[in-house]
From Swiss-Prot:
Function (record text): F(1)F(0) ATP synthase produces ATP from ADP in the presence of a proton or sodium gradient. F-type ATPases consist of two structural domains, F(1) containing the extramembraneous catalytic core and F(0) containing the membrane proton channel, linked together by a central stalk and a peripheral stalk. During catalysis, ATP synthesis in the catalytic domain of F(1) is coupled via a rotary mechanism of the central stalk subunits to proton translocation. Key component of the F(0) channel; it plays a direct role in translocation across the membrane. A homomeric c-ring of between 10-14 subunits forms the central stalk rotor element with the F(1) delta and epsilon subunits.
Transmembrane segments: 9-29, 52-72
HAMAP family according to UniProt: ATP_synth_c_bact
Keywords: ATP synthesis, Cell inner membrane, Cell membrane, CF(0), Hydrogen ion transport, Ion transport, Lipid-binding, Membrane, Transmembrane, Transmembrane helix, Transport
Source species: Rhodospirillum rubrum (strain ATCC 11170 / ATH 1.1.1 / DSM 467 / LMG 4362 / NCIMB 8255 / S1)
Membrane topology listed for this record: Multi-pass membrane protein
Name this polypeptide is given: ATP synthase subunit c
Entry-linked CDD domains: ATP-synt_Fo_c_ATP5G3
Cellular component GO terms, alphabetical: plasma membrane; proton-transporting ATP synthase complex; proton-transporting two-sector ATPase complex, proton-transporting domain
Assembly and binders: F-type ATPases have 2 components, F(1) - the catalytic core - and F(0) - the membrane proton channel. F(1) has five subunits: alpha(3), beta(3), gamma(1), delta(1), epsilon(1). F(0) has four main subunits: a(1), b(1), b'(1) and c(10-14). The alpha and beta chains form an alternating ring which encloses part of the gamma chain. F(1) is attached to F(0) by a central stalk formed by the gamma and epsilon chains, while a peripheral stalk is formed by the delta, b and b' chains.
GO molecular function: lipid binding; proton-transporting ATP synthase activity, rotational mechanism
Subcellular location field: Cell inner membrane
Reversibly protonated during proton transport, annotated site positions: E58
Length: 75
């Protein structure tokens, strides 16, 4: 296998981390909407935790993107 093909395969595998992050963000917001629907008084508290969870989950996707780009262009 030549080096260019290995770089492409590695970048593709690193990008798989973004799929999991997308699923996680969807689950966070779906559960937040369901929780506020059941208990509207808890909206401010639940919304804060939702944004924190979103930020942490999205950071994982950004790390996966950075690794994929490093594998493509710097390795």
């Amino acid at each position: 296998m030549d080096a260019e093909a290995a770089k492409m395969i590695g970048a593709g595998l690193a990008a798989i981390g973004m799929i999991g992050s997308g699923i996680g963000v969807g689950n966070i917001w779906a559960n937040l909407i369901a929780t506020v629907g059941r208990n509207p008084a808890a909206k401010s508290t639940v919304e804060l935790y939702g944004w924190i969870g979103f930020a942490v989950t999205e950071a994982i996707a950004l790390f996966a993107l950075v690794v994929a780009l490093i594998l493509l262009f710097a390795a």
